[in-house]
């Protein structure tokens, strides 16, 4: 029996409502593979993004919590606990690697090759950068370096298209600037470049805020607020590095909200 595209989309929406995101991913993977040389609709594209974002987000949160506990146990000298925690962290890292490999293959094999508009190209290249960045968050040594290089290439390719094809107020262009700046700050340890990129994107969007359409006003202004929040946080940390240490356990950066 042939798998029906509309049925898969419906089941993905149902899975989203039930907060069963692993199943939502599976349904949207079917859709992406069904379309062959066609492009996903904006709705399908957003469903795919939301599905993977939730699946990866839960594991990223777990990894951060486990890593924080590991550091505390190390500081106490509880070597036996540390060994158990490291083993458990490896399980989460394997899950993270598998999820990232899944979406990156889908992007390279189906989604990026069929993208025909500037908007969809930026969307998928940004997504590619995001999932390589998630790998760079927990990988070490040569693997981390490779993930960071792939992230930079994807974000730069997306940025080149966004600067030409999308207005400064476009939520996808703003989301790209937000996540690219987080990459500079968190992975490349370059707060100056992170702040420059975030400030430039914010200032360019503010200058054209009057021309912003009603349909994207909410998304665009939300991401602009996130850019400003990061700028405030990063600037204060650069002026007083010790301030960042006082926020133990807090997420030190914010990323874009999905549609």
From Swiss-Prot:
InterPro entries: 14-3-3 (IPR000308), 14-3-3_CS (IPR023409), 14-3-3_dom_sf (IPR036815), 14-3-3_domain (IPR023410). Belongs to the 14-3-3 family. This is 14-3-3-like protein. It comes from the Eukaryota. It holds the Pfam family 14-3-3. CDD domains: 14-3-3_plant (cd10026). Residues 238-259 are annotated as: Disordered. PANTHER family: 14-3-3 PROTEIN (PTHR18860).
């Amino acid at each position: 029996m042939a798998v029906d595209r509309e049925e898969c989309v419906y089941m993905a929406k149902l899975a989203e409502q039930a907060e069963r995101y692993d199943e939502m991913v599976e349904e949207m993977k079917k859709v992406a593979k069904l379309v062959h040389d066609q492009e996903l609709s904006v709705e399908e594209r957003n469903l795919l993004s939301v599905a993977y974002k939730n699946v990866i987000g839960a594991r990223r949160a777990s990894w951060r919590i486990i890593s924080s506990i590991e550091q505390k146990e190390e500081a106490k000298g509880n070597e036996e606990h540390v060994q158990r925690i490291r083993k458990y962290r490896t399980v989460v890292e394997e899950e993270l690697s598998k999820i990232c490999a899944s979406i990156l293959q889908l992007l390279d094999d189906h989604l990026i090759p069929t993208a025909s508009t500037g908007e969809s190209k930026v969307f998928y290249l940004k997504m590619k950068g995001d999932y390589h960045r998630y790998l760079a968050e927990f990988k070490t040594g040569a693997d981390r370096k490779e993930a960071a290089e792939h992230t930079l290439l994807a974000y730069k390719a997306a940025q080149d298209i966004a600067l030409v094809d999308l207005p400064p107020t476009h939520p996808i262009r703003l989301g790209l600037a937000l996540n690219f700046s987080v990459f500079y700050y968190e992975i490349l340890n370059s707060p100056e470049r992170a702040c420059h990129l975030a400030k430039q994107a914010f200032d360019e969007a503010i200058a054209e805020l009057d021309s912003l359409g009603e349909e994207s006003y909410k998304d665009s202004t939300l991401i602009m607020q996130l850019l400003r929040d990061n700028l405030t946080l990063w600037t204060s940390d650069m002026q007083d590095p010790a301030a960042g240490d006082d926020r133990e356990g807090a997420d030190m950066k914010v990323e874009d909200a999905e549609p």
